[in-house]
């Protein structure tokens, strides 16, 4: 056996993810910060990302977190994030809810009812997490995300196929272009998801070409990494319906924690959302995040995002010595064209090996 890892699979309002919590050698990742560990992981273990997220172990919407020992005082657990896209600057997209559900319901960390409070350490920095627990289950997870901020508001952006679209730029754990679905002529419903996906990819490409982003606290974060598309809610009890989409075409079925944080930063900058005011946003499938701004500073906010997660399976993933696809594979029937194109050379190299 070449590789064996233990994992918990879970979904957050329909968004699938995997928490990898055991595997020989995978805790020995060098770095004095989780950001450095993520960088090392990308440079030396990117084959593992491909193995876990591509077929036959993954599918286009798959993502994963790898639990690692924390680096900062006060952190209960650290993790790096594996997404479908591979970039030279760095993914910091948090996936905290499924991490906490996996940690507590698996018994890795002790659960205290009715409330358990933890500090998790993703690459973007420490985040406080509060879990409402009952009967040995995590019922609701609230996360105080990283400081979030808008850097541009309603800038006219020429998007091929969609004309001039007002776009804002905001950080919520990733840098996003934030746009209104009505300006794109799309509707956030499952049967039109492909249209939303293609429009969001076009927005991200246009924003990368024309709009600048620089994170004031990390010079390695200097590119717009995705698109948040916002629409009116279907349920009048909510304030918005939204999704976040990456350049690879990976799109959230949940409202997206990082995307919601960026959207809240835009609303705050416009004067449309105040500290302490509730903000409820729904995803493609109707799942709701309950949010509010818990504090503000010089141009930034700390958003609190509340949502639910469910465990869907417990797994031991293996790679046998003679597996002809040691990094997995993709095909053009269900995978985005860009992903298939970048994977072709990798597959050829695997076969040569």
Which sequence ranges carry the predicted segments?
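Glycine-rich ThDP/TPP pyrophosphate-binding loop and its adjacent helix/strand module
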Residues: 173
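A glycine-rich beta-to-alpha transition motif near the start of alpha/beta enzyme domains, typified by
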Residues: 1-168, 180-353
């Amino acid at each position: 056996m070449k590789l064996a890892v233990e994992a918990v699979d879970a979904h957050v309002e329909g968004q699938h993810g995997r928490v990898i919590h055991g595997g020989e050698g995978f805790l020995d990742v060098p770095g004095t910060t989780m950001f450095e560990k993520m960088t090392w992981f990308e440079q030396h273990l990117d084959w593992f990302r491909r193995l876990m997220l591509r077929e036959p172990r993954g599918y286009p919407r798959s993502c994963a977190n790898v639990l690692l020992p924390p680096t900062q005082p006060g952190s209960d657990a650290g993790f790096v994030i594996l997404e479908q896209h591979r970039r030279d600057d760095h993914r910091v997209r948090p996936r905290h809810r499924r991490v906490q559900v996996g940690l507590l319901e698996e018994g890795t960390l002790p659960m205290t009812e009715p409330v358990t409070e933890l500090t998790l350490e993703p690459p973007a920095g420490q985040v406080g997490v509060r879990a409402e627990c009952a009967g040995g289950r995590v019922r609701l997870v609230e996360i105080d995300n990283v400081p979030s901020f808008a850097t541009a508001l309603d800038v006219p952006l020429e998007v091929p196929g969609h004309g001039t679209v007002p776009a804002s730029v905001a950080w919520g754990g990733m840098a996003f272009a934030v746009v209104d679905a009505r300006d794109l002529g799309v509707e956030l419903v499952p049967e039109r998801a492909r249209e939303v996906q293609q429009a969001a990819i076009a927005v991200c490409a246009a924003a990368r070409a024309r709009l600048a982003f620089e994170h004031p606290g990390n010079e390695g974060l200097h590119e717009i990494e995705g698109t948040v598309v916002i629409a009116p809610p279907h349920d009048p009890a909510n304030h918005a319906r939204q999704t976040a989409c990456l350049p690879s075409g990976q799109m959230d079925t949940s409202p997206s924690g990082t995307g919601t944080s960026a959207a809240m930063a835009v609303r705050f900058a416009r004067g449309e959302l105040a500290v302490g005011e509730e903000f409820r946003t729904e995803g493609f499938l109707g799942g709701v995040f309950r949010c509010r701004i818990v504090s503000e500073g010089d141009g930034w906010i700390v958003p609190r995002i509340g949502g639910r997660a469910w465990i869907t399976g417990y797994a031991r993933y293996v790679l046998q010595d003679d597996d002809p696809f040691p990094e997995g594979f993709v095909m053009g029937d269900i995978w985005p064209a860009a992903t298939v194109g970048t994977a072709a050379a990798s597959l050829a190299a695997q076969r040569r090996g």
